Amino acid sequence: MKQASAIPQPKTYGPLKNLPHLEKEQLSQSLWRIADELGPIFRFDFPGVSSVFVSGHNLVAEVCDEKRFDKNLGKGLQKVREFGGDGLFTSWTHEPNWQKAHRILLPSFSQKAMKGYHSMMLDIATQLIQKWSRLNPNEEIDVADDMTRLTLDTIGLCGFNYRFNSFYRDSQHPFITSMLRALKEAMNQSKRLGLQDKMMVKTKLQFQKDIEVMNSLVDRMIAERKANPDENIKDLLSLMLYAKDPVTGETLDDENIRYQIITFLIAGHETTSGLLSFAIYCLLTHPEKLKKAQEEADRVLTDDTPEYKQIQQLKYIRMVLNETLRLYPTAPAFSLYAKEDTVLGGEYPISKGQPVTVLIPKLHRDQNAWGPDAEDFRPERFEDPSSIPHHAYKPFGNGQRACIGMQFALQEATMVLGLVLKHFELINHTGYELKIKEALTIKPDDFKITVKPRKTAAINVQRKEQADIKAETKPKETKPKHGTPLLVLFGSNLGTAEGIAGELAAQGRQMGFTAETAPLDDYIGKLPEEGAVVIVTASYNGAPPDNAAGFVEWLKELEEGQLKGVSYAVFGCGNRSWASTYQRIPRLIDDMMKAKGASRLTAIGEGDAADDFESHRESWENRFWKETMDAFDINEIAQKEDRPSLSITFLSEATETPVAKAYGAFEGIVLENRELQTAASTRSTRHIELEIPAGKTYKEGDHIGILPKNSRELVQRVLSRFGLQSNHVIKVSGSAHMAHLPMDRPIKVVDLLSSYVELQEPASRLQLRELASYTVCPPHQKELEQLVSDDGIYKEQVLAKRLTMLDFLEDYPACEMPFERFLALLPSLKPRYYSISSSPKVHANIVSMTVGVVKASAWSGRGEYRGVASNYLAELNTGDAAACFIRTPQSGFQMPNDPETPMIMVGPGTGIAPFRGFIQARSVLKKEGSTLGEALLYFGCRRPDHDDLYREELDQAEQDGLVTIRRCYSRVENEPKGYVQHLLKQDTQKLMTLIEKGAHIYVCGDGSQMAPDVERTLRLAYEAEKAASQEESAVWLQKLQDQRRYVKDVWTGM
């Protein structure tokens, strides 16, 4: 430990201590400025209390250790207890009512619950949209005021089935007026000296009146619900009134219910309204981000009434909100106290009971965690949640005392921002400059804008989800056809995992299983060896759920082989917003079950609440049932009588397309999909691992063929051009040369366009002639004909710009080509090949790829070009299935048969892929006792801090004696560009020595420039060493190729 250091402190002013450093209306901002001056930790003495403030992410990581620190109620929150009592926000962790209420209310904020709130959220969001759409031109909008109305009405309706009807009032609801005044007074009381406070008689009387107004409304809500109970209403209030704590069996008393309602009405709207206000400000001051978010809203929110699933697909808008919370966390601090004497950072002593406050805005701008652009608004930094620095992002607080309503707030904010962007152009007509208003939370002060309606369809609202839930019929259980036992165990605090377990059991009964459910802890020491065991669980702040903790500890203590005979599968519930603990417990259970001898029925499934959870779950369930039925040799599946047969009539599995059948494709299940480039890079390279079926084999150096799908954006462009709907069903009939299409059977047009035809190929001459023949405008027809008649024009205007048939159809509306002709002219969607970057010697049924994601400005000058396959792969989630097949290249790109043969490997960028597999194989061979020949790897990338792929893994391989690595970089500032051929030239003598010893040379990557340059360098090396002519070096290299000692795996083009 370092020598103890005094904690920095600003200048002290006698009995006022450090108080003069605080500006009256800018308490939080004053503390931020002190942090700028004094650094990541400082002491601040108020009259009567001394506090420590931290903002450096390493120090925050320490104070967020719940074994050392717990939530502290500062003076401000203690004053809020006057009306918040021992509600969730203003209670101490040790108070019985916090623990009881926390357990009772958690299920209302599960992912499953969010879907139930969708129509109510949409109801209130629509009122905002309608209000703004009816404004006169140039009429000002007070953003924070309208967002306060919106978020109050939303929590009122979703939580308590109460309508504040704020949009139908000229002034704020009396509850809001009293609440805001009471919050401000509570904060003011916390800053006053004792004598000052005693003199504020009139202010204190108003404070009590405001508390009475809030209590009166809430007590009336409780009384009305008690007088008119409704079993069909499953909201927060019903849970508070009737639900029993699963631990104590007790319900909440009326006084605590009052405190909880007030807590949710305050916390459930103040922070979210501030978030939306700041988000609009950030977008208006960053037009390029506004455009990108608006494009996503247009692309995704295509229905008049947006569905829950569509809101989940607003990924960039969610990134905008996350980045807004990073720069402007609306709850800007949380306070803790030390449970025992401790030391921070190895040098700052903290005594027991010492308050420590985390300044979240400064934490979120810590350049040591976020990089040099920490002050910039860059939503893209949240594209890969796993890259978010651990303990450097805390907008919702920490651990078990983190905001219970996080998912609710983000779901609401995502919906509202998406709808606002879809329907309005936002105008910063005053050139507003940010001024932050402080109370318990922060928000933009006096932020006003104008809006202009966009040409979009009017929004309709139907509260259909609730009606659908009521109308659902209980599935009819079929009599068991085979009676195979199915035990579905769950670990659940929020209720999501338990609900999924119940649904899986119900599905199992319909399929003829004898199914039952139970908490994981109920089966400690008695997992059955007969039948299947399914485990559905979540992580809770990185720890097991309450009813799974004992099971996890029991698993850890088992010896290897003790679970032999148990057949199992795991599905995990999680949220990537908490990157550091995402899927920790499900993955731990899955790995330990396997390690202790159990047989895995299928790869783990992972549902991400920050993404399309239902899609992840459905994909895993389909795979689980298929592989479980196969494992137990069950052929008959009972019909699910509550599902219309029509819903499965038109399903088209990826491996059932004509192209897939032609290639013998099978389903690979995604086990991992992670970013390899750093957050500082603007590009993307993904490491993707697939589990392939038993019996499918591959070798190092093989290719994996992927049958991709066209993006939703591309497909939507086709639908829009031809006036089609995504749910239109068609039947294709035609001649034999169209055998790549699904003939003579119904198929949804969106499935056809997604999986069967190429939409991004440059238009062929034949296609252009056909387009011209269907064009009724003579000048436009002539333009199209000219593109075909002149080879130079065709190459320059079509091929060089990669203009597609769809591009021309959009450019020439007078072209009346029918959809069936368009479809007939499109080529079959071709497989894309990737070098396998793994070795079967490590995992026989796991294949990995290293995929460079193609996203760049289109050569046509029209927006962004996105590679079909790389973007399809990049967006796959764990548990998703991809149609794929294995191919061995004819070039002989395989490891030498003799491990002692030297190897020279050249693979810049993603060309490193096969060599990663080679190195894995060499590691296994070495462990088995083989003597390895020397191996050189030449790798190049742009910058060591951006795209040095697999750096740590390769460094370890080099330390283990498996390979010698030579690296070069082409984009390092103030340094000459370095490419692999330059390294080869430097190593001429070494290379020739190895080649004379029989070395095999492998080149993988770009075939247009890199590979020819490498070949030229090898020939020059031979000429220099042997004093040979160009002709002789050419013969020498050709001979190496003929002997399969010089092999290439290269590609050209975009």
UniProtKB/Swiss-Prot annotation:
Which parts of the sequence are marked as the site Important for catalytic activity?
A: 271
EC number of this enzyme: 1.14.14.1, 1.6.2.4
**A GO molecular-function annotation:** FMN binding
- What triggers its expression? Negatively regulated by the transcriptional repressor FatR. Is induced by fatty acids such as oleate, linoleate and phytanate, that bind and displace the FatR repressor. Is also induced by palmitate, likely via another mechanism. Transcribed under partial control of SigM ECF sigma factor.
Annotated FAD-binding FR-type domain ranges read 663-896
Q: List the disulfide bonds.
A: none
Q: Where is this region: NADPH--P450 reductase?
A: 476-1053
* UniProt region (Disordered), positions on chain: 462-482
Please classify the protein's predominant subcellular localization into one broad category: cytoplasm
Record carries keyword Membrane: no
The record's SUPFAM superfamilies line, in alphabetical order, gives: Cytochrome P450, Ferredoxin reductase-like, C-terminal NADP-linked domain, Flavoproteins, Riboflavin synthase domain-like
Q: Which cofactor does it need?
A: FAD; FMN; heme b
Pfam families xref list: FAD_binding_1, Flavodoxin_1, NAD_binding_1, p450
Q: Name one GO cellular component term.
A: cytosol
Please state every residue range assigned to the domain named Flavodoxin-like: 486-625
Which Gene Ontology biological process is one annotated for this entry? fatty acid oxidation
Which PROSITE patterns does its entry note? CYTOCHROME_P450 (PS00086), FAD_FR (PS51384), FLAVODOXIN_LIKE (PS50902)
Residue spans of biased composition, Basic and acidic residues class: 462-480
Where FMN is bound, by residue? 492-497, 539-542, 573-575, 581-583
* Residues given in the record as heme binding sites: 403
Keywords, comma-separated and alphabetical: Cytoplasm, Electron transport, FAD, Flavoprotein, FMN, Heme, Iron, Metal-binding, Monooxygenase, Multifunctional enzyme, NADP, Oxidoreductase, Transport
Q: What does this protein do?
A: Functions as a fatty acid monooxygenase. Catalyzes hydroxylation of a range of medium to long-chain fatty acids, with a preference for long-chain unsaturated and branched-chain fatty acids over saturated fatty acids. Hydroxylation of myristic acid occurs mainly at the omega-2 and omega-3 positions, in approximately equal proportions. Also displays a NADPH-dependent reductase activity in the C-terminal domain, which allows electron transfer from NADPH to the heme iron of the cytochrome P450 N-terminal domain.
Family note: In the N-terminal section; belongs to the cytochrome P450 family.
Q: What is this protein called?
A: Bifunctional cytochrome P450/NADPH--P450 reductase 2
| Species of the source | Bacillus subtilis (strain 168)
Q: What lineage is on file? A: Bacteria, Bacillati, Bacillota, Bacilli, Bacillales
